[in-house]
């Protein structure tokens, strides 16, 4: 897509640097979406003229930008700006060539032809050799046939033999129909001419480091997580994983694969053992053989409820790798490379069998009055009192998830606080409310709660929601919210938490897709429209950090001074506390009498230190635990679903409602007007 704009002259005199153009001072109009009519209202001069129709013009400071090209059109200088297309979400390696305007997904060059990523092809000269391009890597391998009968038929011009009939495992398949035998997602069979032909999928070699790859559910081959962005390398060099290889350089990828850098494309050839030596103990590539062994000679291994053929390998429990060797299962422990620390931007992940350095997840924090710290590290304050989109997936029209926050003023004119958090995931709505109350689709629930798509539990003093979509939400039951986004969501999110692309300068992109220069305009653009009345009295401006009496200021600084104490000192050199200190003072200056408003800033700073692997000595349970219920109630993750009140305390009968998490009156007390009291103190009926 091209955007056109004209070039105007402030003074009409010959331009010495650009022949044929009658101006020396040039201004671009309509570069940033400014309407031409509006721009012309405050600019004077005339459109720059030129002589040679159709000539491409070089204009200093304008055409230096590779996205802008100026031509002589109708005797006037007309410039066009290229608008870059959005790259596919499946693109794992985006490159930008020097002098080019737009990024593109890294493809492959092979034998003089160019191929897009994910493209597979075979040539007439080598019909049984499969080639596939995946982000700058061409994987060459033989077509791997799977034969399940004693009398397979060979066909001229076909790579794989076929077996008679289209009945497999008792199921009759139609002509042309494809299926996966035994639920094996790596083998595809098809019914062709009344016979069955089966092929094993060959996984392409990936360009990303191993720790950035994963195998999606229901698929055979791994894919790269997220998207890496690099400049195209000169001299035909290749980027493979985290290393750069010179043009012509070769290396052994594994026992079965040799890779060579050829003109910026890494060509990896997988060798396959001949069927006659498949049973050789020295053959390291036996699992890559064509399975042309008669069924009675095929040795299989049963492991649990699964059947594995000879040579197949699989991961087992307790970090073991198992293999089927001549009908016997052999297992050994995975050998881990010791890792003690990670480079900047990486975090040590100990969740798997072996500790590895992985990309840090994005973290967005909301706390206090409220203060927002985006995924990319931009900090701002916003005191709106409605419901807003904190984050959602903007990479698809129908967002698979979104997180909403609802704010209220809590009887103040200048500030607001986060009152509740709402996670909308598919057909489920999870509400995290005050005092750690949890509702699922409107009903209060007990903890822990497990579903196929999310898990909710109390983690210390925080309520934690973990989703399969890659989001993790922590809530303290008061006004602290932390959203953690997995690296594969990078560049896909939007909302008050920003777009998570690694650059905080463009975090203020509003709900209409336009950049906002004012924080309030940005935040209001993410307001959720509803019929609920959410306005408050006219907002009182706050010209300084802390308005109020001397007593209020002294209390604010006295409480917030603890951030500078020995409890947090071990973290000061790694995480700057000044922003948290200012937020703390702001919160304390209009803090309700019954609240410890410094807690949110302390908690936010503690979490930031913990993410850097630094332990601080501050314990929120001592003075800030949100689980400390008020008016005699106690917190229970599975309290009674039937509430005892002054009206029903002496009724006898079982409670058929499920237990729920939240604040409950102890067994010897009843609830009356929001307080837990003894039954004898109930008013006379």
Swiss-Prot record:
<dbReference type="GO" id="GO:0048839">
    <property type="term" value="P:inner ear development"/>
</dbReference>
<feature type="glycosylation site" description="N-linked (GlcNAc...) asparagine">
    <location>
        <position position="441"/>
    </location>
</feature>
<feature type="glycosylation site" description="N-linked (GlcNAc...) asparagine">
    <location>
        <position position="318"/>
    </location>
</feature>
<dbReference type="GO" id="GO:1903672">
    <property type="term" value="P:positive regulation of sprouting angiogenesis"/>
</dbReference>
<dbReference type="GO" id="GO:0042118">
    <property type="term" value="P:endothelial cell activation"/>
</dbReference>
<keyword id="KW-0964">Secreted</keyword>
<comment type="function">
    <text>Inhibitor of bone morphogenetic protein (BMP) function, it may regulate BMP responsiveness of osteoblasts and chondrocytes.</text>
</comment>
<feature type="glycosylation site" description="N-linked (GlcNAc...) asparagine">
    <location>
        <position position="30"/>
    </location>
</feature>
<dbReference type="Pfam" id="PF08742">
    <property type="entry name" value="C8"/>
</dbReference>
<feature type="disulfide bond">
    <location>
        <begin position="386"/>
        <end position="534"/>
    </location>
</feature>
<dbReference type="InterPro" id="IPR014853">
    <property type="entry name" value="VWF/SSPO/ZAN-like_Cys-rich_dom"/>
</dbReference>
<dbReference type="InterPro" id="IPR052424">
    <property type="entry name" value="Kielin_Chordin-BMP_Reg"/>
</dbReference>
<keyword id="KW-1015">Disulfide bond</keyword>
<dbReference type="GO" id="GO:0060395">
    <property type="term" value="P:SMAD protein signal transduction"/>
</dbReference>
<dbReference type="GO" id="GO:0062023">
    <property type="term" value="C:collagen-containing extracellular matrix"/>
</dbReference>
<dbReference type="GO" id="GO:0060391">
    <property type="term" value="P:positive regulation of SMAD protein signal transduction"/>
</dbReference>
<dbReference type="InterPro" id="IPR002919">
    <property type="entry name" value="TIL_dom"/>
</dbReference>
<feature type="domain" description="VWFD">
    <location>
        <begin position="362"/>
        <end position="535"/>
    </location>
</feature>
<dbReference type="GO" id="GO:0005615">
    <property type="term" value="C:extracellular space"/>
</dbReference>
<protein>
    <recommendedName>
        <fullName>BMP-binding endothelial regulator protein</fullName>
    </recommendedName>
</protein>
<feature type="domain" description="VWFC 4">
    <location>
        <begin position="238"/>
        <end position="289"/>
    </location>
</feature>
<comment type="subunit">
    <text>Interacts with BMP4.</text>
</comment>
<dbReference type="InterPro" id="IPR001846">
    <property type="entry name" value="VWF_type-D"/>
</dbReference>
<feature type="domain" description="TIL">
    <location>
        <begin position="629"/>
        <end position="682"/>
    </location>
</feature>
<dbReference type="GO" id="GO:0070374">
    <property type="term" value="P:positive regulation of ERK1 and ERK2 cascade"/>
</dbReference>
<dbReference type="Pfam" id="PF00093">
    <property type="entry name" value="VWC"/>
</dbReference>
<dbReference type="GO" id="GO:0010594">
    <property type="term" value="P:regulation of endothelial cell migration"/>
</dbReference>
<dbReference type="GO" id="GO:0030509">
    <property type="term" value="P:BMP signaling pathway"/>
</dbReference>
<feature type="domain" description="VWFC 5">
    <location>
        <begin position="299"/>
        <end position="358"/>
    </location>
</feature>
<keyword id="KW-0732">Signal</keyword>
<dbReference type="GO" id="GO:0032880">
    <property type="term" value="P:regulation of protein localization"/>
</dbReference>
<feature type="glycosylation site" description="N-linked (GlcNAc...) asparagine">
    <location>
        <position position="255"/>
    </location>
</feature>
<dbReference type="GO" id="GO:0005576">
    <property type="term" value="C:extracellular region"/>
</dbReference>
<dbReference type="InterPro" id="IPR036084">
    <property type="entry name" value="Ser_inhib-like_sf"/>
</dbReference>
<feature type="disulfide bond">
    <location>
        <begin position="364"/>
        <end position="497"/>
    </location>
</feature>
<keyword id="KW-0325">Glycoprotein</keyword>
<feature type="domain" description="VWFC 3">
    <location>
        <begin position="164"/>
        <end position="225"/>
    </location>
</feature>
<feature type="glycosylation site" description="N-linked (GlcNAc...) asparagine">
    <location>
        <position position="116"/>
    </location>
</feature>
<dbReference type="Pfam" id="PF00094">
    <property type="entry name" value="VWD"/>
</dbReference>
<keyword id="KW-0677">Repeat</keyword>
<dbReference type="GO" id="GO:0001657">
    <property type="term" value="P:ureteric bud development"/>
</dbReference>
<feature type="domain" description="VWFC 1">
    <location>
        <begin position="50"/>
        <end position="105"/>
    </location>
</feature>
